[in-house]
Amino acid sequence: MAQIYVLHENNDWVIPLRKAFAERNLPYAEWYLDQWAVDLSGLPPHGVFYNRMSASSHTRDHRYSAELTATVLAWLERHGRVVVNDGRALDLEISKTRQYIRLAREGIPVPKTVAVVGQHALPDALSAFAQGPLIIKPNRSGKGLGVRLYETPEQIVGAAERGELPDTIDGTLLVQEYIRGETGHIFRAEFVGGRFLYLVKIDATGGFELCPSDVCELDTFCPATPRGKKFE
């Protein structure tokens, strides 16, 4: 059995993996990618490498974990190692703009979106929309953090003048058309290798922090603690 390596920066998220590996008696090791040295002239070990890096890593004081992981993945792939969630997956994980472009390339419609770098460019971005409602969101984030809803473009201008727009770790904010669902729910589908696994129905009436993870650090709700029917 090949050694399994889990690349991550959040111990809470790998607890289910540790349990599953132990139950199956699978050999594994963890690479905690917060601060690390990568010898690019050396050879990586043989095995299967599972990338568990998250776009929200910087919210846990791991500012450069995603960038470090990109280097590690490139090193692994250079030497032909088996990688689950390779550099292409990480590239999409940490950039909503690239997610939307890829979706559009595959013929999947996405809401109208304008990427903005710099507050002075905000009026040009807003001019692309005739009216609201609109969403402002960071290009890189996770768990719905930093997503704000505004009913009109003028509300966004006011928020910018007051310094109330969300922080963005890569300097890019997205202005996006907001599409209200008929029931107030959104749906999250999971696929692996092109195969459909499951669909999660999420009540979105209470806000945008909608992470259906096993363990979350949301102030308003944690799916690890059952509460109503927010997640089905």
Question: Each predicted region: which residue ranges?
Answer:
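Extreme N-terminal starter segment of soluble prokaryotic enzymes
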Residues: 1-5
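Structural motif
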Residues: 48-52, 135, 174
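Short acidic/polar capping segments at secondary-structure boundaries
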Residues: 88-90, 117-121, 139-143, 153-155, ...
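Rossmann-like NAD(P)H-binding beta-loop-alpha module
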Residues: 106-133
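Phosphate-binding site of ATP-dependent enzymes
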Residues: 145-232
